[in-house]
């Protein structure tokens, strides 16, 4: 029996990161977490490209451009959508998650969804490096593992 499991080694891998600028005080912490993870696992700064977009809604389009460029072993999507008093949250969070999943499936490149979708600012802060860890770090870890797994399966 052969078991496939992606290694947690980023040496030689190239990563694209798409960052939604809206709620930047939260998203900047997600980006720091992602970069920390990639570097700790052997990624070189020259193998990491960061692209800023206005907000989470724009993430799928740029993640598609990055994934289909074939320059990256994985693309990491970072953003923060925080519920307000209108249905805007539901539209944005739903479309971003669907869009990112679609890009990953169509491109055959791991496109990792690390966009926070929280009910309030406190939950976002908790997931950006305090009580609940850092979802940017977690997303980078998933990107490393999936990039290696794809290589293993090819």
Curated annotation (Swiss-Prot):
Positions that bind 5-amino-6-(D-ribitylamino)uracil: 22, 56-58, 80-82, 113
Keyword Transferase: yes
Biological pathway: Cofactor biosynthesis; riboflavin biosynthesis; riboflavin from 2-hydroxy-3-oxobutyl phosphate and 5-amino-6-(D-ribitylamino)uracil: step 1/2
Enzyme class (EC, first level): transferase
A Gene Ontology molecular function term of the record: 6,7-dimethyl-8-ribityllumazine synthase activity
Entries under PANTHER family matching the protein: 6,7-DIMETHYL-8-RIBITYLLUMAZINE SYNTHASE, 6,7-DIMETHYL-8-RIBITYLLUMAZINE SYNTHASE DMRL SYNTHASE LUMAZINE SYNTHASE
Name the UniProt record assigns to this protein: 6,7-dimethyl-8-ribityllumazine synthase
Underlying gene: ribH
């Amino acid at each position: 029996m052969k078991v496939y499991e992606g290694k947690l080694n980023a040496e030689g891998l190239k990563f694209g990161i798409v960052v939604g600028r809206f709620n930047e005080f939260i998203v900047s912490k997600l980006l720091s977490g992602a970069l920390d993870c990639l570097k700790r696992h052997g990624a070189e700064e020259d193998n990491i490209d960061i692209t800023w977009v206005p907000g989470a809604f724009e993430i799928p389009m740029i993640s598609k451009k990055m994934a289909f460029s074939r320059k990256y072993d994985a693309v990491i999507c970072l953003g923060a959508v925080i519920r307000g008093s209108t249905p805007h949250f539901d539209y944005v969070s739903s479309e971003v998650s669907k869009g990112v999943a679609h890009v990953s499936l169509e491109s055959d490149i791991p496109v990792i969804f690390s966009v926070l979708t929280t009910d309030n600012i406190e939950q976002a802060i908790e997931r950006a490096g305090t009580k609940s860890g850092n979802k940017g770090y977690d997303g980078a870890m998933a990107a490393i593992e999936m990039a290696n797994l794809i290589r293993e399966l090819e």
